[in-house]
Amino acid sequence: MARGKAKEEGSWKKFIWNSEKKEFLGRTGGSWFKILLFYVIFYGCLAGIFIGTIQVMLLTISELKPTYQDRVAPPGLTQIPQIQKTEISFRPADPKSYEAYVLNIYRFLEKYKDAAQKDDMIFEDCSTVPSEPKERGDFNHERGERKVCRFKLEWLGNCSGQNDDSYGYRDGKPCIIIKLNRVLGFKPKPPKNDSSETVEIYSTMKYNPYVLPVQCTGKREEDKDKIGSVEYFGLGGYAGFPLQYYPYYGKLLQPKYLQPLLAVQFTNLTTDTEVRIECKAYGENIGYSEKDRFQGRFDVKIEVKS
């Protein structure tokens, strides 16, 4: 029995290192060198093929503009303050109840302050009235970075924070700031003023062919009587986004780009009642989706507590 164990142990040790044949794990040094060389060459070739494939693919992709944009969804419409569950609830007499909303708006608007738009090499004045889209050449590096239109805080009126640092929340007249999300090369097409839908829209706001209109209304029938009056503050006094701020050329060509903003103030919401509000952009190339609640529109619930 002991002799059998010794024999088994000896064969195991001999497999690891055979001193007679100079073999390690059943292979000589030359054999190990050949097999290692084979795998180095094999995996090196695989890595080369992979890297070559990636390089060829990268040659077809522009770092400035997506090659295919036909399936890019229309831009989303979002509001500031950005809040969870899109619910704003506060008590005007309690600053703590609306502090987070005010701080959110303040931080967002910091880049729109005059001090942040002083550099004339980057920013330019693009008129105080809406005008046609401002083309800035092709999507390439030949002209370097493209200039950006200035957007002045004063155009946001009561919601600019210049005269009321609570953005209306202290008085129970909350403001929200609306923006159209950035989509590379997107040029909004305002609706023509000849359909039944646009006639209804423009019955409550000024029409301009160079403004993409936005309207905020009660979402449900019971909300329409509770929303009260709605005031809009934007460039030129129009309720929408002026076209001269489009198209957007991307972070590489327009790193300091400022989206045009629209401020909306609800001046006499019914108190102690949750009012559901829908804000919606209207345009020929603005779409809506039940799967994406922010595509071209958004809902927000506001409750002003007494």
Curated annotation (Swiss-Prot):
Residues 63-306 are extracellular. Pfam families: Na_K-ATPase. One of its GO terms (biological process) is regulation of calcium ion transmembrane transport. This is Sodium/potassium-transporting ATPase subunit beta-1. Belongs to the X(+)/potassium ATPases subunit beta family. Keywords: Cell adhesion, Cell membrane, Disulfide bond, Glutathionylation, Glycoprotein, Immunity, Innate immunity, Ion transport, Membrane, Phosphoprotein, Potassium, Potassium transport, Signal-anchor, Sodium, Sodium transport, Sodium/potassium transport, Transmembrane, Transmembrane helix, Transport. PANTHER family: SODIUM/POTASSIUM-DEPENDENT ATPASE BETA SUBUNIT, SODIUM_POTASSIUM-TRANSPORTING ATPASE SUBUNIT BETA-1. It is a single-pass type II membrane protein. The C-terminal lobe folds into an immunoglobulin-like domain and mediates cell adhesion properties. One of its GO terms (molecular function) is ATPase binding. Its main location: membrane. The modification Phosphoserine is found at S11. Disulfide bonds join C126-C149, C159-C175, C216-C279. It is found in: Cell membrane; Apical cell membrane; Cell membrane, Sarcolemma.
